[in-house]
Each structure stands twice: as C-alpha cells, then as structure tokens.
C-alpha cells in the first residue's frame, strides 16, 4: 500500500522551545550519537562527553567517558539503570563501556560510575566507526556493528564486571546499519544493501531482502515489528518469524526513521518542481505513521537547518544552528475533535474519534453528524454507513421514513440489518426488515433472520404473506406444533401432518386450535382416531386424569360429534384399558348418548337393549341427570325408569338418614326426637320419587307421611305439593291417612278447648282475688305504681305489672316465685277454618 493513499489527520503541532537552546548550544555541532529510553536521553559528543537528560529535557548528568576521544554509539539498557557506549580514545583504541545511571549507594555521590570497560579486539587500525549497538534485555549480551561490516558479540556480567567473552560473529562486505537482538538466539542485521537474520547458535544467516537499495536505518517498533528504511521504501517485518508484512513507498529518499509517541516518524527529502522552482531543489518532510492502522497522523515540511533531533517515548525536539529549537507536541484528542467539529469536518472527526479510542457516545455523535453531512450532499450510501455507526443515537423511525420516501431500499435494508445485529431493533424495525426480505425475495436471509426474531412479531407477517417454509422452520425451532400443523394444513400435506403428530403434544395442539383435529379427522378418520387413542393411553399411563379428561372432551365433543359409528368404536377402544372413575363416567355417559343418536338416525330395538347393557356395565359410573335429559328425545321407557331408579338409589346411598330408615323402618316413629321438619320433608321427597319409579317402599312412605302429619305437624299444603308430583298416587292411598289426620286435628281442638277453659277459670279466680284487695293497696310491689290490668302474681301473692315481672323471684320478698300459668306461652291452635282450608287443598288434588 502506498503511503500517499493514507488519510491525513493533524494530531500534532509545532511549538518553539527557547528554554532548551542553551542546552543544545553546550553540545553544539559536537553531537556524534543519541540514545533514548522512555525516561532519559543520552547524547554522545565528538570530544568524549556524555550528556544525559530527563524526560523534560533537563540536564541530570554531564561527564567525560573518554577525554579527547569520540563517543561513537550509545544504548540505554531496558531497565534504564545503566548506559552502554562504544568510544574511540585518542590512541585509536575502541572500548566498550557500561556506566551507572543511578546514584552510588556506597559513595553517596551523584557522579556517574563506570561499571565495566573492555577493549574490543579484531578491529583494523585506523578503525572503522561503530555504526550500531544493541544490549540484550538481561544485560548479558552486547552486539556492536561497524562500518566495515564487522559484528562483534560480547557476553558477560557487565554490571558487576565479572568478566566477559568477545566473538566476531559476522563479517559483511557492506556497512552495518542496525542490529536488533530480538531473541536470545536470533539477531536482526541490516546493512546498506540487505536485511538478514543471523542464528547465533548455528552460526548461520538467512537473507530476507537483497534488492541493492541502500538501507541505512532500521528500528524495532512495539516489540512486534522491525522496520527498515532505504531509498524510497520502508519495509515492515513481523517478529519473530521476520515475515515481510508491508512495504511503503514515498516520493523521495528516507533520511531518518525513529519511534516516539507510540508512532513511527519518517524524515525524507524529495525534489520539488512546483511553484516555478528548479527541479534540482529539494524539500524535507516529516510524517507520523500508525503502521498497524495505516494512518498518516501528521504530515509537515521540515526546515533543512534542523540537523539534530532529540526524541524519546513522549518527546521529539528538533534543533538548528540558526533557529530556535522546536518541539513536536501531540494535541489532546478532545481539542482535535472540537477543532474538527468547528470546521464541520465531521467525517474526519469520526475517524479521529475512532482512532483515538474516544468514548462510544462521542464516536456516535461524530457519526451522526457525518451522516447528516452526507445526507445533505445526497451521498446516501455514505450516510447509511455513518447512520449504522451512530446506532443507537440515530433516529430509526425517521430514517426508515426518509429511506422509504426516497425509495432507497438497499440502504434501508443495510441499516435495518445493522440495527438488528447490534441489538437495537424493536418491533417496528424488525417487522420492516422482514417485510423487505419478503418483497426482495431474499428468502435465505429471511429464513436466517426469523429464526432469531421474536415469534409474536415475525409469525403474523409470515402468515400474512404465506411464507410457509419460514413458518415451518420457526415452528420447528421454537417448538410450536400448531405453527407446523398450520403449514401442513395450508399445503394439504396430510402425511407430513400425521408424522408430526408422533413428535408433538396432541392435547396441546387441539387446545390451540380444534380446526387441525377436524381437518385430520376428515382426511383419515380411523388413523386420527388411533392417534388420539395413543395419546389418551399415554396420559392414562402417566396418571394425568385432568389432561386426559380435557382431551377426551375436545376429541369427542369437538371432532367426533358428527360420526356416531366412530364415536362408538372410539369409546369401546377406550374401555379396553383401566381408567379412573371420572374418565369411565364420561365414557359411559357419552356412549349412552351415542346410542341415542344412533336410534334417532335409524330406530332399532337392539339400541335400547345396548343402552340397558351400558347402564348395567357402568356400575353407577354414569351422569344420570344429563342422561335422563338427553334420552327425552327417544321413547325408551325401560332405560328411563332404570336411570331414575339408579339415580334415586345413588342419592340415597350417600344419605345416612335414608339408609337408617331403609334398614330399620321403625325409626320413623321416633323421628321427631332427633330430626327437624326439614329433614322429614327431605326423606319424604326421596321415598315419593323412589316409589314412583320402582313401586317399592310403600309401607315406609306411609310411615313417613304419618310422621309428617302427626309428629312434625307439617302443614298439609307442603305435603301435598310433594305428593302431586307423583302421578301414581291416588286418593285411595291417601284416604286412610287423611282420616287419621282429621281425627288427630279434632282431638287437638278438643284439647285446646279444655286448656282455654282452664285458663278462663284461673282468670276468674284471679279477678276474685283482686276484688278482695283494698283500693289503697292496689300498687305494684316492684315499681309501687298504681296497679292496673294486666298484672301477674307471685306465689307469695305479691302483685306486679306484667312489664315489671322481669324475674322469676319476687322482687318484694325474694321468697315467692312467678306463677307459671301466668307466663304460659300458648301455642298456636288449629281452628276449623284452617282445617276447612286444608280440605279445599285436598279437593284440588282429587279434582
């Protein structure tokens, strides 16, 4: 990929730094090499000095490593505790040195301490300059490259100066430009013409690139890449396999390659033939590259006078002999975004926000603004892209409406797909996308999409537009047997429908829609009946009586109701296995009803015989009330009488009083001692009904009637209301009983008359007694008010108002007691008028 194709963002800005000019002037043009780390910068000079700066470019060390010598290469160790350098002394000897960067604890001095010094042998005299230096992470190995192609390795404990061993591992014909020990056994070597990997253990080398272009600078970037620059090309290799990942090209020649701010900076020169200038004139440019994301984050012209560059991980300063030093600073991301928004560069703002890893809300805001910009420019394809990136900030309802108005179906589909993929599609968006898939005939996408959509949204749309295959898939995935059956019914695929019954829950299916059962029954009655019986037997074996009863009602009443023959076969099959009492009651009742239907269709005496057999086989497990009602349509007297008899006996079996009377009829004589008149009427109703069916228990019925009249003295009208319901009762049956009742009434009337006479005599005696009392003494012995009638007397002959007689003990003397005859609660007596009224009721019965 060509570097000119990268997008350009202004994330950096120049800033003059006059305060550090003095520092630069102190070393001036004597700089020979620079070593950097995250916290320090080390500068070597041509007069043997080493100047160490901190991250703020403040001087912290300034010492001579070799007086009157030259510092050729500097390397700061990975832990930044020591500095390694290659120096050339005044006698042209080359030395390898290690200097401590931390204050000495023994001497309490801040002066640098030389930890190790070793003369390098094998270098011709006069020596070629050292061009590259690399120290391993564990500070146990140092490799140094020279301009004559020589590579020397020194191994030892340099920090503690415990000795070392020197080897010449390579002799190349070209100058060494860079060395990187990226693993303990592999050394990256670049020369001015080729790139290679040297395996230290095997003493072998593998040439990676040999294109003849001078390669004079290379760096290790983020521990993952090794980059080599030469001519117009920048090659990026991955470690540790050293595979060429990318090659970038510039319209010029590379001068410098370094890493700072986590980016790769390249400085190159190119010829300038623009603006009327001569073609042989050249300009310098600097670019900041993000190698992984392939962005040019900064691009600027660079003055020719800037000949020295100090840089570390977070600083990059350019020095010139004629101008004030300038620092390249990285702008805050918020500032860059605000600047772009102010210029309405919304697209670039979105890309910058993405690159900088801004908060998601910030990225979405930028994307939404960029979408609006593209929409104004009628660039709907890009607008869709930004709308997607702005989810969920984008107004989906407004976008759908706009796209539909403009008939931008493709863009709308893309937007809705992204909305669904990000989980922000709701009912309106989901239904719209399903509709688009159907109309665009994208059935594969429709099938995939509906499998993950809510059923309540997708199913109605699929049903409306007859997307049967998708409905079947949805029913299979979501385990919706009714949906699958609906598809089979729509297709008329009976065989597949019956096969589906093998794996689905038939009761659940029929509860959802009875139309499926009717369709299957009409298609193949016997096959459906067998399937229904199979499901019923499964429920029966599991003991699920409630569900079994429900499906029986659904299948029998809703599906088999029009086919009597199937009903009888179905019920006979069910009776072959053991069932609960409730289920058997339903089966026998419906079987009796089916026979009645059969009789209505074609009369046959055998039908009544079969009905009698069903009643006998049911052993009381029959719904007698409903059976009696339904059999009113046919003239089966024997069946009806038998049902009434069984019903009566069934009711009597649950009544302890009736069972007691049946077992011992003499109990009736003492019925009033234990039971009330309501109980007597209840017993009377039962025996009247039972007699009308079987002509049994006449003697008990007579005794019950006698008890109602004589013991409980129930008004005859209540008794007659019960008796008239029985058409078999006649006056001959009632005559003896009525005569006895009349005699009893006469006796009671005479008894009442005698009681009245006794009361009258008592009143007369009281009146005479009252006449003997003096008028002055006729006061109430309780309230001492004037005594008037009515009054009561105590046994002690004290008299009180009737209202004052609230106690049974005399309130005057506390010795007497209230006369019982005075407080006698007279019962209501029967009169001849009442008797004659009852006679009229009897006459109405006889008539």
From Swiss-Prot:
Give the top-rank taxon of the lineage listed in the UniProt record for this protein: Eukaryota
Mention any one GO cellular component term assigned to this protein in its UniProt record. Answer: HOPS complex
Residue intervals of every RING-type zinc finger in the record: 780-814
Q: Which stretches are CHCR repeats?
A: 387-526
Biological process annotations from GO:
endosome organization; intracellular protein transport; organelle fusion; vacuole organization; vesicle docking involved in exocytosis
Q: What keywords were assigned to this record?
A: Cytoplasm, Metal-binding, Nucleus, Zinc, Zinc-finger
Q: What is this protein called?
A: Pep5-like zinc finger protein C16A10.03c
């Amino acid at each position: 990929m060509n570097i000119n194709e990268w997008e350009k963002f202004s994330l950096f800005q120049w800033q003059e730094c006059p305060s550090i000019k003095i520092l630069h002037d102190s070393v001036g043009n004597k700089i020979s090499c620079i070593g950097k780390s995250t916290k320090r910068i080390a500068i070597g000079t041509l007069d043997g000095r080493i100047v160490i700066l901190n991250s703020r470019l403040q001087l912290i060390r300034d010492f001579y490593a070799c007086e009157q010598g030259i510092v050729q290469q500097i390397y700061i160790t990975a832990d930044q505790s020591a500095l390694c350098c290659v120096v050339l002394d005044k006698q042209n000897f080359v030395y390898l040195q290690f200097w401590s960067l931390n204050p000495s604890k023994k001497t309490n001095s801040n002066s640098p301490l030389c930890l190790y010094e070793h003369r390098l042998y094998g270098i011709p005299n006069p020596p070629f300059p050292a061009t590259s230096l690399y120290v391993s992470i564990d500070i146990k190995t140092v490799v140094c490259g020279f301009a004559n192609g020589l590579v020397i390795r020194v191994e030892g404990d340099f920090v503690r100066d415990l000795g070392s061993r020197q080897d010449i591992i390579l002799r190349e014909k070209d100058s060494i430009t860079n060395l990187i020990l990226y693993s303990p056994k592999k050394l990256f070597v670049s020369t001015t013409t080729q790139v290679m990997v040297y395996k230290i253990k095997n003493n072998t080398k593998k040439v990676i690139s040999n294109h003849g272009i001078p390669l004079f600078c290379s760096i290790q970037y983020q521990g993952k890449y090794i980059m080599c620059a030469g001519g117009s090309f920048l090659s990026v290799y991955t470690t540790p396999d050293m595979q060429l990942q990318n090659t970038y090209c510039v319209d010029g020649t590379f001068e410098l390659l370094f890493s700072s701010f986590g980016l790769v900076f390249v400085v190159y020169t190119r010829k300038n033939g623009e603006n009327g200038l001569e073609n042989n004139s050249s300009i310098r440019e600097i670019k900041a590259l993000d190698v992984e994301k392939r962005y040019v984050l900064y691009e600027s012209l660079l003055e020719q006078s800037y000949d020295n560059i100090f840089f570390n991980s977070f600083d990059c300063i350019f020095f010139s002999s004629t101008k004030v030093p300038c620092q390249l600073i990285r702008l805050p991301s918020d500032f860059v975004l605000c600047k772009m928004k102010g210029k309405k560069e919304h697209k670039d703002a979105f890309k910058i926000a993405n690159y900088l890893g801004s908060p998601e809300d910030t990225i979405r805001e930028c994307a939404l603004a960029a979408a609006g910009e593209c929409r104004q420019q009628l660039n709907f394809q890009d607008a869709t892209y930004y709308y997607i990136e702005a989810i969920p900030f984008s107004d989906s309802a407004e976008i759908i409406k706009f796209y539909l108005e403009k008939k931008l179906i493709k863009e709308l589909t893309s937007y809705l797909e992204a909305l669904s993929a990000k989980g922000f599609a709701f009912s309106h968006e989901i239904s719209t996308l399903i509709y688009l898939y159907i109309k665009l005939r994208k059935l594969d996408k429709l099938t995939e999409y509906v499998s993950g959509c809510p059923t309540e949204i997708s199913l109605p749309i699929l049903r409306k537009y007859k997307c049967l295959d998708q409905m079947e898939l949805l029913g299979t995935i979501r385990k919706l047997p009714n949906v699958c059956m609906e598809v089979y019914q729509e297709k008329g695929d009976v065989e597949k429908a019956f096969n589906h019954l093998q794996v689905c829950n038939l009761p659940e299916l029929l509860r959802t829609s009875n139309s499926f059962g009717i369709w299957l029954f009409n298609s193949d009655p016997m096959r459906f009946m067998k399937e229904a019986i199979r499901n019923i037997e499964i429920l029966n074996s599991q003991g699920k009586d409630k569900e079994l009863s429900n499906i029986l009602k659904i299948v029998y009443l809703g599906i088999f109701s029009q086919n009597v023959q199937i009903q009888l076969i179905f019920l006979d099959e069910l009776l072959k296995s053991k069932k609960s009492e409730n289920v058997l009651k339903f089966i026998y009742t419906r079987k009796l009803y089916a026979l009645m239907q059969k009789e209505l269709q074609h009369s046959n005496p055998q039908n009544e015989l079969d009905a009698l057999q069903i009643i006998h086989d049911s052993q009381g497990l029959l719904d007698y009330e409903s059976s009696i009602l339904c059999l009113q349509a046919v003239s089966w007297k024997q069946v009806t009488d038998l049902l009434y008899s069984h019903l009566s006996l069934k009711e009597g079996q649950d009544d302890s009083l009736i069972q007691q009377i049946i077992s011992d009829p003499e109990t009736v004589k003492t019925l009033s001692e234990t039971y009330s008149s309501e109980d007597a009427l209840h017993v009377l109703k039962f025996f009247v009904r039972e007699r009308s069916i079987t002509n049994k228990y006449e003697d008990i019925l007579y005794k019950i009637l006698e008890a109602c009249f004589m013991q409980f003295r129930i008004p005859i009208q209540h008794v007659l209301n019960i008796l008239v319901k029985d058409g078999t009762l006649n006056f001959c049956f009632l005559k003896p009983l009525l005569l006895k009742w009349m005699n009893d009434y006469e006796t009671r009337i005479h008894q009442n008359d005698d009681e009245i006479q006794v009361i009258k005599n008592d009143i007369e005696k009281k009146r005479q007694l009252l006449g003997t009392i003096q008028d002055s003494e006729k006061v109430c012995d309780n309230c001492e008010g004037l005594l008037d009638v009515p009054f009561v007397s105590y046994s002690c002959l004290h008299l009180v108002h009737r209202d004052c007689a609230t106690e049974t003990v005399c309130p005057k003397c506390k010795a007497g007691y209230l006369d019982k005859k005075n407080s006698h609660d007279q019962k209501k007596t029967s009169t001849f008028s009442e008797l004659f009224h009852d006679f009229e009721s009897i006459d109405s019965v006889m008539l």
